């Protein structure tokens, strides 16, 4: 088998859907016994108390009864295709979007609530 360069692998990843990449990550985790989760550094709390984060990760916790409406909201917010959005909803709890400003996250929460879903950050 020919050895693949890092560029070859990256070029292959660019052609994959988000669902295919998710499956690849799970296969790598299983094969090598590792986790793709980033290590979390524990920092000391500021003396004045913890300030609200400026950016959050919006996580879909519960889909509720109207899955189709939730898929539409996911597609609108993320720009994902139908199959990728459906997979994200089917695999709840799942991350919808990372690095979201708090005000935008509140708007997303409202959109998901209108569709019957529950999100948190």
Swiss-Prot record:
Keywords: Ribonucleoprotein, Ribosomal protein. The keyword Ribonucleoprotein applies. SUPFAM superfamilies: ClpS-like, Ribosomal protein L7/12, oligomerisation (N-terminal) domain. GO terms for biological process: translation. InterPro entries: Ribosomal_bL12, Ribosomal_bL12_C, Ribosomal_bL12_C/ClpS-like, Ribosomal_bL12_oligo, Ribosomal_bL12_oligo_N_sf. The keyword Hydrolase does not apply. One of its GO terms (molecular function) is structural constituent of ribosome. CDD domains: Ribosomal_L7_L12. One of its GO terms (cellular component) is cytosolic large ribosomal subunit. Forms part of the ribosomal stalk which helps the ribosome interact with GTP-bound translation factors. Is thus essential for accurate translation. Homodimer. Part of the ribosomal stalk of the 50S ribosomal subunit. Forms a multimeric L10(L12)X complex, where L10 forms an elongated spine to which 2 to 4 L12 dimers bind in a sequential fashion. Binds GTP-bound translation factors. Belongs to the bacterial ribosomal protein bL12 family. This is Large ribosomal subunit protein bL12. The gene is rplL.
